[in-house]
């Protein structure tokens, strides 16, 4: 009996600790979600909303009503069948089908849990996803989310409203990014987007794009939908500093490599390879007509996005 009582007390204590830890974790998550909400909503309201709106204008025109012709109306819109039947000229009125469906695909593989300065790659990805989500609902669009690594880990179908967007952000923040050795499969994310997006949609693909086996699938997705890639890379990939002898861990393969960064020759080679990879990827995207934004973890991403969307609006 004493041992049973002791076990009960131990279980009760463990449960209380679990409840306390859950409460603390929930508070931390809510705090982080709130911080992201305040920052990204302010960006949307102050800078970004108009640029988003001018880029995404709905699926086209849809029939609204038939009404009598009044002087000044466009005669090309006359409905001759109704005009003949009533003996009075009537017009067919069309309205822009404004509502869009937006899907945000976020790479949550292990390579995103890296950051040499203030941001992890995934942290920047989450903030950009939140900003795009608030832009979508401000535009009266539906927005959905898919988290992927080498499989689709979570999918939330597109809906409207602030509560829905806060749920999206909470689910991203609450995701287990520390689970080691999650690999990247862009092809898996693209195949999933093709499968679930029946009507033309706006699709944002946020990743570091370390995987390179998806070009045919991307061409097809880009043909059917309005797809924009956001490639997030770390600041050290562009400008590698002298950090002494360091151990570099590949979070997707689990491999470790020692590098002597005191050698300028090694630093220059690393930097040259990284820049060549970024430039080569950008060129491939351009060749298939895929819109790409490349953003470093220490860049002012708001400025980059605004420049991109303004340039894109001028093209259309």
Language model features: what each stretch is:
Residues 1-13:
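Single conserved hydrophobic/aromatic residue that forms the stacking wall/gate
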Residues 202-208:
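Acidic beta-strand-to-loop metal/phosphate-binding motif
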Residues 103, 146, 204, 228-230, ...:
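Hydrophobic/aromatic beta-strand patches that form the interior of the parallel beta-sheet core
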Residues 85-86, 209-213:
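Short beta->alpha connector loops
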Residues 108, 209, 232:
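Residues immediately flanking
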Residues 23-56, 65, 74, 192-199, ...:
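Von Willebrand factor type A / integrin I
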Residues 18, 22-156, 202:
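An amphipathic, basic-hydrophobic helix/alpha-beta surface used to engage anionic
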Residues 164-201, 213-214, 234:
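Von Willebrand factor
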């Amino acid at each position: 009996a004493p041992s049973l009582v002791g076990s009960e007390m131990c279980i009760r204590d463990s449960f209380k600790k679990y409840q306390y830890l859950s409460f603390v974790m929930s508070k931390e998550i809510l705090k982080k979600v709130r911080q992201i909400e305040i920052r990204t909503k302010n960006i949307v309201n102050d800078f970004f909303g108009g640029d988003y709106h001018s880029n995404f204008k709905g699926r086209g025109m849809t029939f609204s009503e038939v009404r009598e012709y009044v002087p000044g109306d466009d005669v090309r819109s006359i409905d001759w069948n109704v005009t003949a039947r009533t003996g009075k000229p009537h017009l067919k009125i069309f309205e822009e089908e404004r509502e869009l469906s937006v899907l945000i695909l976020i790479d949550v593989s292990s390579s995103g849990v890296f950051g040499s300065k203030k941001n992890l790659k995934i942290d920047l990805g989450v903030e950009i996803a939140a900003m795009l989500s608030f832009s979508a609902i401000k535009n009266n669009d539906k927005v959905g989310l898919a988290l992927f690594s080498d499989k689709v880990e979570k999918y939330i179908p597109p809906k409207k409203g602030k509560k829905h967007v806060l749920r999206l952000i909470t689910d991203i923040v609450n995701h287990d990014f520390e689970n080691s050795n999650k690999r990247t499969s862009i092809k898996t994310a693209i195949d999933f987007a093709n499968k679930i997006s029946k009507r033309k949609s706006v699709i944002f693909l946020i990743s570091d794009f370390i995987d390179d086996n998806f070009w045919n699938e991307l061409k097809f997705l880009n043909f059917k939908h309005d797809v924009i890639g956001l490639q997030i890379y770390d600041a050290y990939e562009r400008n590698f500093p002298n950090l002494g002898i360091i151990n570099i861990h590949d979070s997707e393969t689990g491999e470790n490599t020692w590098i002597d960064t005191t050698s300028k020759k090694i630093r220059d080679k690393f930097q040259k390879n990284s820049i060549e990879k970024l430039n080569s990827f950008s060129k491939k995207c351009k060749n298939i007509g895929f819109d790409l934004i490349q953003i470093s973890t220490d860049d002012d991403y708001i400025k980059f996005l605004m420049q991109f969307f303004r340039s894109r609006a001028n093209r259309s």
